Amino acid sequence: MTDNLFFRLIQNAVGTADGFGPVVPSAEEWSAMNREAQKQTLLGVCFAGVQRVCGAHPEQAVNLPAALKMRWLGAAANIQKRNEVMNRHCVELQEMFDRDGMRLTTFKGQSVAALYGEELRGLRQAGDIDVYVECGREKALEYLRKKDIDNGGWDYVHAHPKIFNDAEVELHYRLSISHDLFKNRKIQEFWGSHVADFFAGKAELPCGEIVCPSDYIHLFYLLHHAFRHLISGGIGLRQMMDIYFAILRRDAGMDARLMKDVNDMGMTRFASASMWVLRTVFALPEIPSLWNADEAEGQFLLNEIMAGGNFGHGDTRFRHPTSRAGKLVEIARRNLHLLSHYESDALAAPFYYIWHFFWKRIQICRMWFRRRA
């Protein structure tokens, strides 16, 4: 019952529902909705739902504890302040790289928040700042070195430069990866053939303009990103909400192409499951030109989302070790229950991390020899 109320609260926030129907949530149910919003990193957006219910149907909010409402209000205000900081840093990054003649685009994060609309964009809980720079790994690391910026550690996909004291930055030189090394070759070729689309959009933030991907690439990327994190640790409803707003923003004339590209990357089952989740949680209407909602796969995906929370951080079914070996063992153990749904990707994930361990050491050796030459 609480899950249904929580979904209804989300629907009030995004404008697909009006109140809770005949139900008047109890104080305990309001507290449970608040806890779930925290777990899913949707506190800010859900507070917009609280405000709508209180404004349009005050009789349904009579059991909302005043102290809880004030804490929720405070959390939403802090989220808005955090978004102001992140927006400013995104514009600063754009200006810095523009001055240095390097093409940079912001994806996920603040550029996705721009899809939420004026009322909700400031209430999306920000994580880090994800940007892509069109120069490759070695040039990106060399750029940071010349700017005297600590790269913060790097891998196959991105570095973590220490540019701001109050915000984490992921500087991507590859947009994303697949854990299946055969699929990874395909996805890198796909990104390579769509580089122009990475820089085709503009996002108007309150403090300035940033470059972002086209709506098409944004939606494809968000699906791929969510699928990858499902395999490597888990996803939450914030990732689903990003996909929801990207679907609303999409050019429907590109739907056939989107379905083909998603199928080519082996993600059709996940996309069909996601459509069921979006219809159940956000009341997304049926879209004949996109995937049919798969209830069986959707139920499995939603169970994973509700059990794990944001990126699986709230999942109590599995351990969360800190050592590399421990993480590898836990990923393998966790992915056993994914085998009947996403076979090749679930099997490939542990081997990807083993491959990456040796790949990085080879790259370090190559960089050392080049500097010595």
Which positions does each model-derived feature cover?
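Conserved NTP-donor binding/palm subdomain of two-metal-ion nucleotidyltransferases/polymerases, i.e.
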Residues: M1-G127, Y132-A373
